[in-house]
Amino acid sequence: MRPRRPLVFMSLVCALLNTCQAHRVHDDKPNIVLIMVDDLGIGDLGCYGNDTMRTPHIDRLAREGVRLTQHISAASLCSPSRSAFLTGRYPIRSGMVSSGNRRVIQNLAVPAGLPLNETTLAALLKKQGYSTGLIGKWHQGLNCDSRSDQCHHPYNYGFDYYYGMPFTLVDSCWPDPSRNTELAFESQLWLCVQLVAIAILTLTFGKLSGWVSVPWLLIFSMILFIFLLGYAWFSSHTSPLYWDCLLMRGHEITEQPMKAERAGSIMVKEAISFLERHSKETFLLFFSFLHVHTPLPTTDDFTGTSKHGLYGDNVEEMDSMVGKILDAIDDFGLRNNTLVYFTSDHGGHLEARRGHAQLGGWNGIYKGGKGMGGWEGGIRVPGIVRWPGKVPAGRLIKEPTSLMDILPTVASVSGGSLPQDRVIDGRDLMPLLQGNVRHSEHEFLFHYCGSYLHAVRWIPKDDSGSVWKAHYVTPVFQPPASGGCYVTSLCRCFGEQVTYHNPPLLFDLSRDPSESTPLTPATEPLHDFVIKKVANALKEHQETIVPVTYQLSELNQGRTWLKPCCGVFPFCLCDKEEEVSQPRGPNEKR
């Protein structure tokens, strides 16, 4: 029996080593917190050069991590940019584009949305054992065939938990001084309808049974009264406030319409609660701000506190919310094993104004803004990555990177695999972030406006430092030389409101980041060579585009029967926020 003891001992050692190894692999997978702000300009943050806007928490995040200064969004509007972020693919590949002027999900009554065959970063991480949560703005669609099918709900894209706004802020969402009065009136009106309905049923049953003698005309008149009452109520509530400005927890609508000024604070509390619930396991939290999109709902604590009006107030409130999330990460002991990423979905909205008040963001030295497919101001966004011990603090990276890079990056750090049946346009950022390589893996980036290619960026691998950018199409500014499209509020992608360039306008962003002076064969010896190189790359890229249905074209038309409703249609106003408890459990779905 004695010879067996070493074997038993060795077996125990091996078992312990395997256990430790498995535990070590688990520990190597970081928690992931992705923070995306809505419509934030790259020039709005202190860490990107703004010395009049107070953003201390985001600035601290930048000091503690890596700051990307040429971080590029795949689109200059919300829905397509976010689809590219989630999938690591240009929106043209998934069909999250339009050949017309409606380039985002228009409302919650359209069947358009991110196709279900797309693989999101949440789905990828879920396969790696992550608990996945989305808190905040979605804007990737909701329903397909009925107001309750929720085919485009975040749960169908890999998220286990959802609390937030399935649409996006619009001007109707805030302020809403009559909200509480209408909620009370609707409650009384619905009670009246129920009483009349009970009376109709009672009289009908009584007449058919011979218990009461009432004319059918009276019964039909009461039925007609209910229908007319419902129609009158529905007709008086056609504003997006009632049908699009709502909050959901899981599948349930909790506020319709929502109190926009308190929504952000509730979402931060939800985020902190999510972090606490999952502090002992590996998780993904995608916190998608409603800030700083117009109409800029801001709490009283921050109203009037900045040097930049309501927009500045909203930015500084957003920064304080980022601080609360970062503090919670520290408080729950998650700091050292949590990768935090911060960005904006696209550039600031230059044309967002109320009188002389600027309600949109500042894009610094970069030309253009939100809605412009090629100009730098619409697509160059903040990019900050912090992962203590893995990513060096205080590092600055000027290489071109993309929001599409986040999916392959989280796949890399989690041990996941990228889908092999489709083109993934993003690249793993970790070698660049950790300093293992000098250059971005991107050689070309393609800049679309809807379904139209507007510009191409070329980053040669010759250590010249040049970043060439060729514009095939540029918007016509209104008024001329204004730098924006103030007549239409957003610039167009095609037709008479754009200028087509042949040969394309050429800039070297390393020398002219503001894209102020186009290069010519007379001023740039490499002009013709660069134009030809870019044209060849564009041709190769276009050959990889597989035709799909454009979600934001024909499907982006409203259907009344798809309008979400928290009650019995059309009596849909409700406030259940205080009544609904937070779902808990292994998958958090409700």
From Swiss-Prot:
Lineage: superkingdom: Eukaryota
Record key words, sorted: Calcium, Glycoprotein, Hydrolase, Metal-binding, Secreted, Signal
Cysteine pairs bridged by disulfides in the record: none
Binding site for substrate: K137, H293, K370
GO MF term list: arylsulfatase activity; metal ion binding
Pfam families linked to this entry: Sulfatase, Sulfatase_C
Regulation: Not inhibited by DHEAS or warfarin.
Binding-site residues, Ca(2+): D38, D39, C78, D345, H346
Job of this protein: Exhibits arylsulfatase activity towards the artificial substrate 4-methylumbelliferyl sulfate.
Protein's recorded name: Arylsulfatase F
Species this chain originates from: Homo sapiens (Human)
